Amino acid sequence: MPAADDPQPLVAGWSKGTFHRVYLLAGPDALTKEETFQRLKAKFIGDDPAGMNTDGFDGADASAGAVLAAAGTLPFFGGRRLIVVRRAQELSTAETNRLADGLAGLPESNCLVLLWDDKADNRSVLVQAVRSA
């Protein structure tokens, strides 16, 4: 799965129905990240008015266990499930490592999106796990 500062190649794939299980949207441009996330959400799950197939977390207080549990839960009524972790760079080192360890086991029907406020460090265990997921 790509971790991208430039969302255009990702968006082109979404139009064709090509999705990855994990995305890392990083960089200081909050507007571009949010617009990219909203486009992914619209393409991936479409209309989910009750929010039954969407979960959100804040990296400042999220645990890897809770994120992975949500990301591992199959969607209601078939379909797809979207999980977002905003400010993912705020996860502690221990939580980051646990999250990285669990990425490979996510169901194909689900998509985990990590929103990173700064440029992501490519040496990070989590960034490397996202790239290989």
Predicted regions located by residue number:
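Conserved beta/loop motifs at nucleotide-recognition and modification sites
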Residues: 1-133
